[in-house]
Amino acid sequence: MLRKIILGASLIMAMTLSAQSQCKKGDCPHHSWMESNVWNNGWNVAAHSSINAKEFHEQYEKNREVWDAMFAYLAKIDLDTLSLGRIDIVPGRCYIKMSEYVPRESEKVNIEQHHNWIDLQYTLRGNEKMGYAKDVTVKHEYNPKKDVAHFNSDNVTYFKAGPEAFYLFFPTDYHQPSVIDGEPVTSRKLVCKIEYIH
């Protein structure tokens, strides 16, 4: 119990520091770095403007070989024809998973958070949106085996998901992926899991 309290307090502190340390787009070296695409290794898909550019930049620099391997792999394959399922890029440190599904209404989709993995989510086709939640309350406690905790919130900001940009969700991001946004059609989405360097 004490361990959970300490872990929770540490995470809240990290989230507060992360929010305080974000700089404004336009005068921020991290945003400039993200928009320069020097990190993409030939994968020409934009990073969505909602991404925490400071966290992205710092994680990339701490774990460059893994990020480079992932982006290089994404640049050389055809994501439209890639088989469904999981592929290890750097065993134990990065893998990708292609899936197809019909998104659901927000009330039926969990708000989630991970401690040890970063999510890159890229919707190739479908009518869906991604949510960032604030003012959350715990729905399901953190499960270390699945690296996920679930939350409730009435304060969620949504962004359209599509082939023009990918999203990154860090441990400081309470996110609600795969929410329906229009007609219920089948989505095709890539999720990349990248180890988070604490």
Give the residues covered by each predicted segment.
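Conserved metal-binding segment of the jelly-roll/cupin
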Residues: K160-V179
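Bacterial Sec-dependent N-terminal signal peptides
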Residues: M1-C28
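A short, N-terminal "cap"/entry segment at the start of jelly-roll beta-barrel domains
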Residues: C28-M98, K108
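His/acidic/aromatic-lined binding-pocket segments of jelly-roll/cupin-type domains
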Residues: I118-Y122, Y158-F159, F166-Y167
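Conserved short histidine dyad/triad with adjacent acidic residue
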Residues: Y95-Q113, L124, E128-V138
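A short hydrophobic beta-strand segment most commonly corresponding to one strand
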Residues: F166-L168, P184-H198
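A short beta-strand-loop-beta hairpin characteristic of the jelly-roll/cupin
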Residues: N127-A161
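Short, conserved beta-strand element in jelly-roll/cupin
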Residues: N116-E128, P144-K146, K193
